[in-house]
UniProtKB/Swiss-Prot annotation:
Listed HAMAP family: GlcN6P_deamin (MF_01241)
SUPFAM superfamilies: NagB/RpiA/CoA transferase-like
Gene this chain is encoded by: nagB
Pfam families from the UniProt entry: Glucosamine_iso
Organism: Vibrio cholerae serotype O1 (strain ATCC 39315 / El Tor Inaba N16961)
The protein, known as: Glucosamine-6-phosphate deaminase
Subunit text: Homohexamer.
Broad class of enzyme this protein falls into: hydrolase
NCBIfam families for this protein: nagB, PRK00443.1-5
Chain's role: Catalyzes the reversible isomerization-deamination of glucosamine 6-phosphate (GlcN6P) to form fructose 6-phosphate (Fru6P) and ammonium ion.
Length: 266
């Protein structure tokens, strides 16, 4: 596992965007051989999406031959609701780049058959072989996507009940009213995520410090689903200084020295 310790959240966004652009351009995607990118929502990746849009407008990257799969979607929230993850992705990213509509893959939280929808999503991912790079965030309790504590580390895309802590955290997007936050969501599984060729997780803020400690220094534990990254051969965590406050000083020092040449300029 790689850990990229940076000073501020803005640097995390820029580093992550530069890493994605590097991977896409190295891959040299075509219509017949697209680059497959997994994407999250939430506050943490906003800086990355902003930087990617700027790099696209500067001619540094094209998303014409990039296929995307999002991590999750609320159940029962209208697709055009301002807080649906579909709306989030179009407003904050898709509407500002040259991605082709048919290459955008999102879970449908309004289907009558959640099981069939989840199977369709898994099958669609498999039709591309695998996801080349999956970017994600992490919750205060260490959850990835909506794989709440005690989720199976071999889980696949499915419907999940959201914990009260998650709904309280997400209520900031619903005028602070937890009653407006859906109780269920469709989400990729931990196993789905681990199938990706590369995983990049963004961690910012002191409230994520315990989750980062669990991911880097803890044991693999289904109560901290982010710890499953330790099982992946090509995982990278990009973090800011506040999120490292629970890590041992020698851990931060080790990775700072190890990644020194990759941090210069950020």
């Amino acid at each position: 596992m790689r850990l990229i310790p940076l000073k501020a959240a803005a640097q995390v966004g820029k580093w992550a965007a530069a890493h994605i652009v590097k991977r896409i351009n190295e891959f040299q995607p075509t219509a017949e051989r697209p680059f497959v990118l997994g994407l999250p929502t939430g506050g943490t990746p906003l800086a990355t999406y902003k930087a990617l849009i700027e790099m696209h407008k500067a001619g540094e990257v094209s998303f014409k031959h990039v296929v995307t799969f999002n991590m999750d979607e609320y159940v029962g929230l209208a697709a055009d609701h301002p807080e649906s993850y579909r709306s989030f992705m179009y407003n904050n990213f898709f509407n500002h780049i040259d991605i082709q509509e048919e290459n955008i893959n999102l879970l449908n939280g309004n289907t009558d058959d959640h099981e069939a929808e989840c199977k369709r999503y898994e099958d669609k991912i498999k039709s591309y072989g695998k996801i080349n790079l999956f970017m994600g965030g992490v919750g205060n309790d260490g959850h990835i996507a909506f794989n709440e504590p005690a989720s199976s580390l071999s889980s696949r895309t499915r419907i999940k009940t959201l914990t009260e802590d998650t709904r309280i955290a997400n209520s900031r997007f619903f005028d602070g009213d937890i009653n407006q936050v859906p109780k269920y969501a469709l989400t990729i599984g931990v196993g789905t995520l681990l199938d990706a060729q590369e995983i990049m997780i963004l961690v910012t803020g002191h409230n994520k410090a315990l989750a980062l400690q669990a991911a880097v220094e803890g044991s693999v534990n289904h109560l901290w689903t982010v710890s499953a990254l330790q099982l992946h051969p090509k995982a990278v965590i990009v973090c800011d200084e506040p999120s490292t406050q629970e890590l041992k000083v020698k851990t931060v020092k080790y990775f700072t020295e190890l990644e020194a040449k990759n941090i210069v300029g950020f």
